[in-house]
Amino acid sequence: MFMSVVNFCGQLSNTQQFDQIRINIASPDQVRSWSFGEVTKPETINYRTFKPEKDGLFCARIFGPVKDYECLCGKYKRMKNRGITCEKCGVEVTVSRVRRERMGHIELAAPVAHIWFLKSLPSRISTLLDMTMRDIEKILYFENYVVVDPGLSILQKGELLTEEELQKAKDKYGEDAFTASIGAEVIQQMLKELDFSKLKQELYEELQTTSSEVKKKKLVKRLKLVEDFLESENKPEWMIMDVLPVIPPEIRPLVMLDGGRFATSDLNELYRRVINRNNRLKKLIESKAPDIIVRNEKRMLQEAVDALFDNGRRGRAAKNANKRPFKSLSDMLKGKQGRFRQNLLGKRVDYSGRSVIVVGPELKLHQCGLPKKMALELFKPFIYSKLELYGIATTIKAAKKMVEAEKSEVWDVLEEVIREHPVLLNRAPTLHRLGIQAFEPLLIEGKAIQLHPLVCTAFNADFDGDQMAVHIPLSIEAQLEARVFMMSTNNILSPANGRPIIVPDKDIVLGLYYLTLAFDNEVGAGMMFSDLAEMEHALYNKFITIHTKIKYRRNQLNAEGKMVPVIIDTTYGRLMVGELLPSNPNIEFKFINKQLTKKDISLVIDLVYRHCGQKATVIFADQLMKLGFKYACSSGISFGMDDMVVPESKSTHINETQLEIQEFEQQYSNGLITYGEKYNKVVDAWSRCTDRVANDMMKEIATPPVNDDPNHQRINAIYMMAISGARGSFQQIKQLGGMRGLMTKSNGQIIQTPIISNFKEGLTEFECFNSANGMRKGQIDTALKTASSGYLTRKLVDVAQDCIITEKDCGTDKGIEVKSVIEGGEVIVPLAEKILGRTAAIDIFHPVTNDLILNKGELISEAKLEQIESAGLDRIMIKSVLTCESTTGICSICYGRDLATGTLVSEGEAIGVIAAQSIGEPGTQLTMRTFHIGGAATKGAEVSSVDASYDAKVKIISRNVVINSEERKIVMSRNCELLLLDNNGNEKARHKIPYGARLLVDDGDMVIKTQKLAEWDPYTIPIITEKSGKVLFKDMVEGITIRDVTDEATGIPSKVIIESKQYSRGAELRPRIQLLGAKGEVITLSNGLEARYYLPVGAVLSVEDGVQISVGDIIARIPKESTTTKDITGGLPRVAELVEARRPKDHAVIAEIDGRVEFGKDYKSKRRIIIHPIDETMSIEYMVPKGKHVVVNEGDFVKKGDLLIDGNPVLQDILKVMGVEVLANYIVKEVQAVYRLQGVKIDDKHIEVIIRQMLQKVEVTDSGGTTLLAGEKIDRHEFDEINAKAMKNGLKPAEAQLILQGITKASLQTRSFISAASFQETTRVLTEAAIAGKVDKLRGLKENVIVGRLVPAGTGYFMDKMRKAAIKLDEENV
């Protein structure tokens, strides 16, 4: 194993062509065959002559010459003696590079266990020998003896004996009656004696007979290990080493420092310890030293080898003089500084430089400004060759001198060299692929790189001192790739959502907004013009301004492509933008004939790209930028104190709210509401107040004061910046001129007293103190967030890196159904947005005319979308990566459109990495918690009613209503939904109506927009009767199940259900209310059950014992917790929780079958919920903690997948109960909800790619006739292959169920051990792989980068394909 790892980290010469890498345990003979000689002395180099000592760790005879073609004693020098071995010093004359490749070895005087196989959990040695690791350690480290052969004694084989016990046994049975031994030798002997085929048979038989689950698991593990050894042809005794490899000296160098001291690699020190102890042990054995001394030396040798392989894994780590632990071989591979991540996945490259960036507004989109000095340094070799070619310099040396002197000819040559030679610019952190783009360099004076303003969004760059790196693609292929794939002009659309990313921002937006403003009473209003020159003339002579409303005759292309004149109302400013538009019938002037905000500009750029192509878009964007900058400058927009307007109505609103709050305080003192309810109401009232003040302020800012002075600023500058999308948000303006509003404490709880002042008025000391807490929390969150966001991205990339488009069509008929996302009655994401760029899974017909709209497998383009929308389809079957059936990778048809180009994705595209980047890149914008804007709380008022958002017809699903004494309709169903339908019967909105709500409309009613449909109390959950009768309290014992809680503040008592203590001989009390009829019998409800209402802990009673109540009355209320104690995991942690498939805190419980609910007998602190299915088969029981809020009542009918307990459901449960599609929909919905809150748009398909990677494995439930074991987890495709083989041989196929894995686990269990090792837990992965003799087929990106080949994506994919085809042809020809 050792050599494979070394070889694989060494440089590979071009002659070695390979397709896969295999890892094995190295046998002693193999180690000796690699070696060029035995290292017997611990010396390194001679401190006087600085030559390596003979037979030492740097010996030239073993490892090769120190200088090229020169032996150590200097007898043979130069090339002519190549290959000769010097007879005097024994050194072969060759290149010194061999000191990086040649290995040595140490013959150990006693065998030593390899610590990876001993201590890497689960310990392989202990599993094989079926002993505990502790016992194995006792034997290895010479604490206990082990019985190898019990002979005539009654001792057991494998039994451990201490020194005294051994002595007693010898006295009892005689010296030779049994054999017991100690140390690594005995372990080696025991491993040698294992007969794997026999052991396999025994384990298999035992597995069939045993019934204990724990034992089964243990047997399966052992069986798996035995099978691994059998298949890989590794011998178990190789886990104990007789010979130790010594890695090449150049890999563990010894360097001389200035002061004559030496710096050495820790490995040399660790090797020296091993050699010293080994030599001492040899001497002790030769001199027949006492057993106890020899044994101690053997133990020390074992410890020295342990430290060399993995320092600190067992016992105390070996430390140097400065008390710093030595860096062992394992540490060389592990972690961020290890070989994998530091040198193989991330390399430093030459031909690169970095400098500060400045803005380059006069550049074209494909250009960047490169400082002359920098270019001269970067392009040196190119300049030398050109100087020589033109005969300006005679030799390279002369050319070098000329460049150093910076002669004038050099600059001319440099100009020529860089012409059309793209350079790559990169800004760290590179969070997505647009963080590296190619530009054509322009030589500039100065020392800073100039960057085009429009690419700043993609780089996330600003000019406050950011630095960027420049890289030069050298080969012609690299230049070609840079130009075709990476040029900034080829990256107009964002790969995350397919929208333009080259959009004007900040100043440009402000300039364009100013330019397209139109004012009413301007000079020359209503004038008519026929061409632009005429208008320019009028503008120059001040007959009009750029904002004057005028009429203009403009020639436009119609649908047939002919020019037709139209008269339009516009302004000169808007016409200037209009002039830049490419002529196309689909791009009408109306798109820009308005006040252009950032959103509008983005839409126009998108339209231009879709209809006129890339070149037109680039030219348009560039011209737009120049225009925007020009007018941002000439508008002279600035703002002062007076632009922050404080609305006059502010004091009124505040006074009203304070009165409202006094009322709540009064209600609380009178005991009408609880503290939690009061808190909620106060927070709500202040939220509403803040919003009202903000709205009034917005109105005042938006309508500027009337003033006849022509030089007077007619529109508020701050308002202009916010409304145009240039800078700032209304949230910020609210705090400048309105009121700051409610603040949060650091634990996320909202402080009841808001900050009434704004920044213009200034905060009082107390307000300042109040807001500091939330602000600091925000600052700290930001600092912590960056790291966890980066880590999430890394895990996502790792899990998805081998997801590549490998074929055009996998031919599957499967797909997923999508519909628009409707929340709270509003369409949040329309269907069009979800299906654009996907492919249809079935033929799609018009529901009325039955015309074919889409063929199966056809891409849904913008044109097709219009047809789908006009047909009024509300759900569609599309293909998805989740249902793709390609064995390696994914097919184009299932993936759909490549968002960055707007066409069908091409083969070889690394969609996994793109998906990971798209989800990870906005990660830093996501909050750690959902509530903050500089500490200000953004909490909407609680929803307590539903209004109609359209004129529509009402449809009520699962309507179960009772009419109460006030003639109101009360909802009694737990899953009542109210739908609003349009004239065609298509769903426009959907609202969930909670239990206990008052319905104000009924099924089939027609409603108008804004009409109230239902209302309820948002702070409590009621328990309502559906029959009238007399109340009877059961099991309500004062102080045991019920308590009078007197509110401290008010002194008003109320009866509250409490946790019941064990009572009277263990009879469990279950507090409930029964309804009695006229004769005192218990009333029967409509579902056939008796009218018994069980009360949960914390319920507050609303009725007295013995009173008469009527239908729809509230018996008790369960208060909802105050807003934040039920902490919503928001932002980044929620995304991580979903993709890691963790169990959420306070998770929900879902019903696994359809059936009726019954509460069984409680058990200790748990409630028992039983679901009886309708067909009277097996009922299912759930045990839930008593404090949890159960959302069902006894007798309720629940459907499979309904929640029994509130909270976030566990993903594994959804998969088990509802299947893959529902699970995928849920994850997509939840992840999107987090990003949507931050205004980030990500295409669903990226999340689907990650989900596909999480669903790679299946768990075997029945092994059938295959070699698989029940409970074994195996790759889906491997499982299918094994089954196909079994069926071919006429055996029963195995059965398995899909399992969901978190991304970390999925990354570690990928098929490629190289990729897994470079991710996390390197030693464990490599240990496992070596034992199983795993083969890495090098299919993913990471493993290819690590072995230094082209990645099998993009152009590399086709190179790979061509190479394989060529090899196949050659084989056929042979």
From Swiss-Prot:
It is an enzyme of class 2 (transferase). Zn(2+) 2 binds at C810, C884, C891, C894. Binds 1 Mg(2+) ion per subunit. One of its GO terms (biological process) is DNA-templated transcription. It catalyses: RNA(n) + a ribonucleoside 5'-triphosphate = RNA(n+1) + diphosphate. Keywords: DNA-directed RNA polymerase, Magnesium, Metal-binding, Nucleotidyltransferase, Transcription, Transferase, Zinc. Its EC number is 2.7.7.6. SMART domains: RPOLA_N. GO terms for molecular function: DNA binding; DNA-directed RNA polymerase activity; magnesium ion binding; zinc ion binding. InterPro entries: DNA-dir_RpoC_beta_prime, DNA-dir_RpoC_beta_prime_bact, RNA_pol_asu, RNA_pol_N, RNA_pol_Rpb1_1, RNA_pol_Rpb1_3, RNA_pol_Rpb1_3_sf, RNA_pol_Rpb1_4. DNA-dependent RNA polymerase catalyzes the transcription of DNA into RNA using the four ribonucleoside triphosphates as substrates. Belongs to the RNA polymerase beta' chain family. The RNAP catalytic core consists of 2 alpha, 1 beta, 1 beta' and 1 omega subunit. When a sigma factor is associated with the core the holoenzyme is formed, which can initiate transcription. This is DNA-directed RNA polymerase subunit beta'.
